[in-house]
UniProtKB/Swiss-Prot annotation:
It is an enzyme of class 1 (oxidoreductase). The chain crosses the membrane at residues 5-25. This is Tryptamine 5-hydroxylase. The lineage of its organism: Eukaryota, Viridiplantae, Streptophyta, Embryophyta, Tracheophyta. Belongs to the cytochrome P450 family. Its EC number is 1.14.14.186. Keywords: Endoplasmic reticulum, Heme, Iron, Membrane, Metal-binding, Monooxygenase, Oxidoreductase, Plant defense, Serotonin biosynthesis, Transmembrane, Transmembrane helix.
Length: 523
């Protein structure tokens, strides 16, 4: 039976009132006689505290709050959960280096408990022996420099399918939805690398549907994550727990089919694929006697899904924002194309070996990370022990948010921070490798420390070869009649922050550098 609006509001008031009482009781029990110097805090609302700031575009709201309070570190109460927000590089460095061990864990989130098979992926696993083992496996086995290089053939093959599609099916008179192209590319690359198959784009396919549902659930708002005492009731009444259980069952079923195919050897390999995919690697590692913690079948599924979900969103969002800014800035676009075509010459295709010479293109990617970070609020950490940040006491079990969006637009850090100018990285030595282990901690698109994203080298390789190929083979512009100031830069917040509206562009084949490949016959 569906709840009426009146009954829903009554239930919400009851839930929030109960939460208020529980918070008050817990505070009274945990109060200490020892005074603490806590970070400043803005006025909050009864019961929910500052939870309203986390709706919509929280990175914008928190950046504005840090600015108006003149507080690079401030404290919030998200429901019954204490939290702090960092908006300056020196504090980010302190959190990710000096206090890395104290801030080594993750909050226990309901979506992670279900969809990460008991929080057993690298992203959501709590600090401890299992997380150390899982991260070591991912870094040394799945995403080592050698392994990332071997996946180059997959990246190139899927990219060439996109280039063939653009060559055969686009014209300047018919704008192309580049957002959809990038989403398909990211899904195809990650699906082949993770599962050894192409992403199923057709309607009715179970794997594609359940992966999309999992991504929606990971990105959604869960009241129990901010009122843990009320989680069982809240998730049951809202239907979220039922939805999570169904998605988990569907994920397990879909993954079981894939794993069984790998074990039995009955899967059909894509022609040309000879290297191990993620499932192959983890099945081999699972048998190793050297693991300090056993790697169960559910752990294996969690690690593979973690790499897929995190990798597709960040790759897609980065490519989308890069091309958005390039078509809005023809001068920068022209300069980037001239560099790519000079380096690649008449060879006819971009190879990953060319990327080291594309200095300006790498500055463009860095500038995009600064102005449009795919993850503007880094995945929150949780303190496992009390620590000190910026002279303030941070109690245990406090959630710690690092607002990279605020740091990227801070006029105290960057000249003309709202201007898209890749040259700022050229003058700062940005023409070298895209070293995201920034010693100044001004640029943190993939986090840092022991919780930094282990897959950033794979994502960067995909972004760089894709962008270089698009610049080499095609001419790009805004659709006829659309001015740069007309392009909507509004965002949608989720696992990665992407454009709210799809990016439509005018594209035509380059007369001098037209793509010619065997993939043309497949499209």
């Amino acid at each position: 039976m569906e709840l009426t609006m009146a009954s829903t509001m009554s239930l919400a008031l009851l839930v929030l009132s109960a939460a208020y009482v529980l918070v008050a009781l817990r505070r009274s029990r945990s109060s200490s006689s020892k005074p603490r110097r806590l970070p400043p805090s803005p006025p909050g609302w009864p019961v929910i505290g500052h939870l309203h700031l986390m709706s919509g575009m929280p990175h914008h709201a928190l950046a504005e709050l840090a600015r108006t309070m003149r507080a690079p570190l401030f404290r919030m109460r998200l429901g019954s959960v204490p939290a702090v927000v960092i908006s300056k590089p020196d504090l980010a460095r302190a959190a990710l280096t000096t206090n890395d061990a104290a801030l080594a864990s993750r909050p226990h989130l309901l979506s992670g408990q279900f969809l990460s098979f008991g929080c057993s992926d690298v992203t959501f696993a709590p600090a401890g022996p299992y997380h150390r083992m899982a991260r070591r496996v991912v870094v040394s086995e799945l995403l080592s420099a050698r392994r990332v290089a071997t996946y180059g053939a997959v990246r190139v093959k899927e990219l060439r399918r996109l280039l063939a599609h653009l060559t055969k099916n686009t014209s300047p008179a018919k704008p192309v939805d580049l957002s959809e192209c990038f989403l398909n590319l990211a899904n195809d690359v990650l699906c082949r690398v993770a599962f050894g198959r192409r992403f199923p784009h057709g309607e009715g396919d179970k794997l594609g549907a359940v992966l999309a549902e999992a991504q929606d659930l990971f990105a959604g708002f869960t009241i129990g994550d901010f009122f843990p005492e009320l989680e069982p009731v809240a998730s049951t009444v809202t239907g979220l727990r039922r939805r999570l259980k169904k998605c988990l069952a569907d994920l397990r079923e879909a993954c079981d089919v894939i794993v069984d195919e790998h074990i039995s050897g009955n899967r059909q390999r894509i022609p040309g694929d000879r290297d191990e995919d993620f499932v192959d690697v983890l099945l081999r590692v699972q048998k190793s006697p050297d693991l300090e913690v056993p790697l169960t079948d559910d752990n294996l599924k969690a690690l593979v899904l973690d790499m897929f979900v995190a990798g597709t969103d960040t790759t897609f969002a980065t490519l989308e924002w890069v091309m958005t800014e390039l078509v809005r800035h023809p001068r920068i676009l022209k300069k980037a194309q001239e560099e790519v075509r000079r380096v690649v010459g008449d060879s006819g295709r971009v190879e990953e070996s060319h990327l080291g010479e594309l200095h300006y293109m790498r500055a463009i990617i860095k500038e995009t990370f600064r102005l449009h970070p795919a993850v503007p609020l880094l995945v929150p950490r949780e303190s496992v022990a009390p620590c000190t940040l910026g002279g303030y006491d941070i109690p245990a079990r406090t959630r710690v948010f690092i607002n990279t969006f605020a740091m990227g637009r801070d006029p105290e850090i960057w000249d003309n921070p709202l201007e898209y100018s890749p040259e700022r990285f050229e003058s700062a030595g940005g023409g070298g490798e895209i070293d995201l282990k920034d010693p100044d901690y001004k640029l943190l698109p993939f986090g840092g420390g022991r919780r930094g994203c282990p897959g950033y080298t794979f994502a960067l390789a995909t972004v760089q070869v894709s962008l270089a190929s698009l610049l080499y083979h095609f001419e790009w512009a805004l659709p006829a009649g659309v001015r740069a100031e007309d392009v909507n830069l509004d965002e949608t917040f989720g696992l990665a922050t992407r454009k709210k509206e799809p990016l439509f562009v005018a594209v035509r084949k380059s007369d001098a550098y037209e793509f010619k490949g065997e993939e043309l016959s497949e499209v």
